[in-house]
Amino acid sequence: MRVKGGSITRQRRRRWLKLAKGYWGHKSIGFKTAKQAVVKSWTYAFRDRKQRKRDFRKLWISRINAAARNQGISYSQLMYKIKQSNIEINRKMLAEMAVHHQSDFENIVKLAIAKSA
C-alpha cells in the first residue's frame, strides 16, 4: 500500500517557512533555503547571546574609564582602589552612575581614593 504524506509534509514545510518570515529573497519562499537560513539564524543567536555579555562589559568599562579620567584617575587605578576600600559595586552600576548620576560617581571615586590611601 502506498503511503501519502502530503498534508504532514505541507505542515512541516509551512512551519519552517513561518520561522523564515521576513527573510530577504528566496530565503523566505523556498523551503530548503528557508530551513538553512533559520538554522543559521539560530547559530548566530546562540553565538551572539554570549557575545552580548562581552560587548556590554566593554561598554561599561569604556564609560567608567571616561568618567574616571574626568576625575583625574585611570580605570585600572579606580577599580584597584574600589576593591581595596571594600566598596561592593559592580561595573554595570558604576557605568550607570557615570552616565546618569555624575555627582554620585564623583563621591564614590573620592571615597575610594580616601579609603585606599
UniProtKB/Swiss-Prot annotation:
Disulfide bonds: none annotated. One of its GO terms (cellular component) is ribonucleoprotein complex. One of its GO terms (biological process) is ribosomal large subunit assembly. InterPro entries: Ribosomal_bL20 (IPR005813), RIBOSOMAL_L20_CS (IPR049946), Ribosomal_protein_bL20_C (IPR035566). Coiled coil: none annotated. Keywords: Ribonucleoprotein, Ribosomal protein, RNA-binding, rRNA-binding. SUPFAM superfamilies: Ribosomal protein L20. GO terms for molecular function: rRNA binding; structural constituent of ribosome. The keyword Ribosomal protein applies. The keyword Ribonucleoprotein applies. Belongs to the bacterial ribosomal protein bL20 family. Binds directly to 23S ribosomal RNA and is necessary for the in vitro assembly process of the 50S ribosomal subunit. It is not involved in the protein synthesizing functions of that subunit. This is Large ribosomal subunit protein bL20. It comes from Mesomycoplasma hyopneumoniae (strain 7448). The lineage of its organism: Bacteria, Bacillati, Mycoplasmatota, Mycoplasmoidales, Metamycoplasmataceae. The gene is rplT.
